[in-house]
């Protein structure tokens, strides 16, 4: 039950879940818990002094997060992505703050890849600081799985962000269809074009729409009630336990 519950947060989940063979009668729509987490921490996020601490100004930097295995551990993808990042730094001529995971930092050091001096490799940032940086960046370039959800939430509270996903596929197609982020790929041409577009559209107010499943702030309540309501059913039908 748990895997079906957690995995059923997508708007177009029915098609995907049916393909996996999960039974419809034990699959429930919950939505993503990210909106609740962001809302619960929003005051702290907005009060963060991270820009002052690391010497950045609103709309005068690009925020980078690149840590996924396919981008870091695959040589071809790694070289393509960071060559594109260097090109981005050269084009925009502003700091690119890289919240760098230890594994990514080790990979960069081991490879000897030379980053543009404007790419500032920073220790991993905490939740509130990172989201404050997202809210104030000219653009966010990230392979994080939560970027579409965060973008949708910020759009719903009237604070859109220019979100660019450095991947070639996404588990969040409903947010892509809603126009909440741009799926850029990892080549120089793709990244530059996507970033240009994301920034221009944000500045002109050409925005997507919040994805309902990513702005629902009742997810935790629904999860608890579904679990409580179906404990006996699952015990009987799945685990074949006597009542």
Where are these predicted regions, by residue range?
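Single conserved hydrophobic/aromatic residue that forms the stacking wall/gate
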Residues: 1-7, 12
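Helix-loop-beta element that forms the nucleotide-linked donor phosphate-binding surface
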Residues: 15-33, 38
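Short acidic-hydrophobic, aromatic-tinged amphipathic segments that line or gate anion-handling sites
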Residues: 28-29, 120-124, 182-187
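Donor-nucleotide binding loops and adjacent catalytic segments primarily
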Residues: 45-136, 241
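A donor-sugar binding/catalytic signature common to diverse glycosyltransferases
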Residues: 130-175
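C-terminal amphipathic helix plus adjacent low-complexity
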Residues: 200-243
């Amino acid at each position: 039950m748990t895997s079906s519950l957690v995995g059923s947060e997508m708007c177009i989940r029915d098609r995907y879940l049916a393909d996996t063979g999960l039974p419809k009668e034990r699959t429930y729509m919950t939505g993503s818990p990210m909106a609740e987490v962001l809302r619960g921490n929003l005051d702290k996020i907005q009060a963060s002094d991270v820009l002052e601490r690391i010497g950045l100004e609103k709309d005068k930097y690009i925020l980078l997060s690149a840590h996924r295995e396919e981008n870091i551990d695959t040589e071809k993808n790694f070289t393509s992505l960071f060559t594109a990042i260097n090109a981005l730094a050269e084009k925009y001529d502003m700091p690119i703050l890289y919240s760098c995971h230890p594994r990514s930092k080790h990979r960069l050091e081991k490879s000897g890849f030379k980053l543009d001096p404007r790419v500032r490799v920073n220790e991993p940032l905490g939740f509130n600081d990172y989201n404050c940086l997202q809210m104030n960046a000219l653009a966010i370039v990230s392979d994080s799985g939560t970027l579409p959800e965060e973008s949708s939430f910020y759009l719903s509270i009237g604070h859109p962000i220019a979100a660019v996903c450095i991947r070639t596929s996404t588990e969040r197609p409903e947010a892509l269809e809603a126009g909440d982020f741009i799926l850029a790929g990892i080549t120089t041409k793709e990244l530059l074009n996507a970033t240009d577009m994301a920034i221009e559209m944000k500045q002109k107010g050409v925005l997507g729409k919040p994805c309902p499943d990513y702005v629902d702030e009742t997810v935790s309540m629904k999860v608890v009630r579904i679990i409580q309501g179906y404990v006996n059913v699952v015990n009987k039908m799945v685990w074949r336990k006597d009542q």
